[in-house]
């Protein structure tokens, strides 16, 4: 007979052990320990208690005096609470209500019954509301519950309901200075306008006169630059705390200075003007459907993957370039409908502020430009080359954000349009485009540190070469493509490869390339499923999105492609299609206050 061993596993063993203990418990057989709590006697099996509870396992297996006792006194918990916990250890079910959960949680924590503690926490989180929030939070704090994720869910509820909670006396009594400071410091507290947060802080201070001494500290965690001047004058300066707090007066003065210095706002990187937002939104500034201008609404790809619309500047403008400066969006040039009913190159510049969902008209460029490129370096926005209906030029000018003024700088080496520009490591890279002779592979980089004097420069200043430097050419000549910087490299997508001047026909370029500035080398990556031009690009969740454009099957697109740089793969249908098919769109990632998005949602 063979000596091979085969193992058979019972499918009912675990259940039979549990049911066996339950049967012994119900029949009061082999019970070997009595637990005495508040004059109540609970009989049980040591073996079962030790398998269910770390507390009892140590008690009955370690060198403790209770190990050999058959009667054990337990203090610090209630008989009612322990009765539920003991039943849970035998039967695996736990009956919870708001009347009993405190005693049950106390007992479960006492005997270190982790699963019962988790059930109590889940119950409390499911039942939490405005009326019992303070009670629930105090309860969990009193027992120092350390269940993973509980504090995060509590904080999420509080941040979501901060303003209505601060109208409740019980919550005002509960909320400590330390917790208030932490919540006011959070970017997740984005559902409410800042003035409502200020009014909530006033309620907390007024709840207890002894809290007034904390006013200076608390107001430093409010962001007064996110309010409006009317908020400041009507609700802040009229309060008793404005007279009481020197720090509050200082914060107000700084906010009023911020409001007054309109041009400098995009460069003011302070906590007071930073939007309360955790995740950026993908914003699409709309362009054209074919040769027809569309309205100037902004499309927002909001989570969970829903398109919303925001109003844009009320002009018949198709911007060609978009520059982002510290979460302000500048739309520049492009084409606009003239009084003659024809489209003309535009010199107009608009600034969008998502803090207040507001637009400003800024100083026009020195010359109208379409099909040009821009880049932001320091306090300047550079506009490079481009064309009008009648002329292609090489002139380069820069916009001084503080002075709201344009000036010419060293021009691009050749006349060009249809190129693309992106800033990387403080330098402006220009790729591709159309010169007088052909579609280009050329790559030039502009280094402002080597720039000549801008004094007396005009659109026709002779070419200098000290600040423009040629880099390795792309593998493919292209124009009307898109380029974006990501993880220290430049990625180029699509465009037009060849323009046949005799017939004005074009050939699409589905290729993707990446440039490494450290090696000055271009590498070909996976091609797009179908070539396109006039599309938009943005980075979202470590992936690069390609939106809309003119595909080379002859159709305009409303689709979104996503490219994973790490896997070098394209995906389709990761995101919903745009509400309409667009060409010439400008795309970016912007942070919006949640209350602005909530208003958009209600209006959509």
UniProtKB/Swiss-Prot annotation:
PROSITE patterns recorded for this chain? Answer: BTB
Q: What is this protein called?
A: Kelch-like protein 15
Q: Name one Pfam family in it.
A: Kelch_1
Report each Kelch repeat as a residue range. Answer: 328-379, 381-426, 428-473, 489-542, 544-592
Tell me the organism's taxonomic lineage.
Answer: Eukaryota, Metazoa, Chordata, Craniata, Vertebrata
Q: Name one GO molecular function term.
A: ubiquitin-like ligase-substrate adaptor activity
Q: What does this protein do?
A: Substrate-specific adapter for an E3 ubiquitin-protein ligase complex.
UniProt domain BTB: residue ranges = 31-98
Per the record, the pathway is:
Protein modification; protein ubiquitination
What GO terms describe the biological role, i.e. biological process, of this protein? negative regulation of double-strand break repair via homologous recombination; nuclear protein quality control by the ubiquitin-proteasome system; protein ubiquitination
Keywords assigned: Kelch repeat, Nucleus, Repeat, Ubl conjugation pathway
Q: Which PANTHER family match?
A: KELCH-LIKE PROTEIN 15, LD33804P
Q: InterPro entries from the entry?
A: BACK, BTB-kelch_protein, BTB/POZ_dom, BTB_POZ_KLHL15, Kelch-typ_b-propeller, Kelch_1, KLHL15_BACK, SKP1/BTB/POZ_sf
Show where the BACK domain sits: 133-237
- This protein's source sits in the domain of life called Eukaryota
């Amino acid at each position: 007979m063979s000596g091979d061993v085969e193992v058979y596993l019972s499918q009912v063993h675990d259940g039979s052990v549990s049911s066996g203990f339950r049967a012994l418990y119900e029949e009061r057989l082999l019970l070997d320990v009595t637990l005495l709590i508040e004059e109540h006697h609970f009989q049980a099996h040591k073996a079962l208690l030790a398998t269910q509870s770390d507390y009892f396992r140590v008690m009955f297996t370690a060198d403790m005096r209770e190990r050999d006792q058959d009667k054990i006194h337990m203090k610090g918990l209630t008989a009612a609470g322990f009765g539920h916990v003991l039943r849970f250890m035998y039967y695996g079910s736990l009956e919870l209500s708001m009347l009993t959960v405190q005693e049950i949680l106390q007992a479960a924590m006492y005997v270190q019954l982790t699963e019962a503690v988790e059930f109590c926490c889940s119950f409390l989180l499911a039942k939490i509301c405005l009326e019992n929030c303070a009670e629930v939070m105090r309860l969990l704090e009193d027992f120092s519950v350390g269940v993973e994720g509980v504090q995060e869910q509590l904080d999420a509820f509080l941040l979501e309901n901060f303003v209505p909670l601060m109208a409740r006396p019980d919550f005002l009594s509960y909320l400590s200075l330390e917790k208030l400071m932490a919540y006011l410091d959070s970017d997740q507290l984005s559902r409410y306008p800042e003035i409502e947060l200020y009014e909530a802080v006033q309620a907390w201070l007024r709840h207890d006169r002894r809290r007034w001494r904390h006013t200076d500290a608390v107001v430093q965690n409010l962001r007064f630059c996110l309010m409006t001047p009317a908020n400041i004058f009507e609700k802040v300066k009229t309060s008793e705390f404005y007279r009481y707090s020197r720090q509050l007066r200082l914060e107000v003065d700084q906010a009023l200075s911020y409001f007054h210095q309109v041009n400098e706002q995009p460069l003011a990187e302070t906590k007071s003007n930073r939007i309360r937002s955790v995740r950026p939104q993908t914003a699409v500034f709309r362009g054209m459907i074919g040769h027809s201008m569309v309205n100037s609404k902004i499309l927002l790809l909001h989570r969970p993957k829903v398109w919303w619309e925001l109003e844009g500047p009320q002009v018949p403008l198709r911007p060609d370039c978009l520059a982002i400066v510290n979460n302000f969006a500048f739309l520049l040039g492009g084409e606009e409908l003239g009084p003659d009913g024809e489209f003309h190159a535009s010199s107009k510049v608009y600034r969008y502020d998502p803090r207040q969902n507001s637009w400003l008209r800024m100083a026009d460029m020195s010359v109208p430009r379409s099909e040009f490129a821009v880049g932001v370096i320091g306090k300047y926005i550079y506009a490079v080359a481009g064309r009008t209906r009648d002329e292609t030029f090489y002139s380069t000018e820069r916009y001084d954000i503080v002075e709201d003024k344009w000036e010419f700088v060293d021009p691009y080496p050749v006349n060009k349009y249809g190129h693309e520009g992106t800033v990387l490591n403080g330098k402006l890279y220009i790729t591709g485009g159309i010169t007088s002779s052909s579609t280009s592979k050329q790559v030039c980089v502009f280094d402002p540190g080597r720039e000549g004097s801008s004094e007396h420069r005009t659109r026709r200043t002779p070419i200098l070469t000290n600040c423009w430097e040629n880099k390795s050419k792309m593998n493919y000549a292209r124009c009307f493509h898109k380029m974006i910087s990501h993880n220290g490299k430049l990625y180029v997508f699509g465009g037009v490869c060849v323009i046949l001047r005799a017939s004005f026909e074009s050939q699409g370029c589905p290729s993707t390339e990446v440039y490494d500035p450290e090696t000055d080398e271009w590498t070909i990556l996976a091609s797009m499923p179908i070539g396109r031009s006039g599309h938009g690009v943005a980075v979202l969740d470590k992936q690069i999105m390609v939106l809309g454009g003119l595909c080379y099957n002859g159709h305009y697109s409303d689709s979104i492609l996503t490219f994973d740089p790490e896997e070098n793969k394209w995906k389709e249908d990761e995101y919903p299609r745009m509400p309409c098919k667009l060409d010439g769109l400008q795309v970016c990632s912007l942070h919006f206050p949640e209350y602005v998005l909530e208003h958009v949602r209600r209006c959509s």
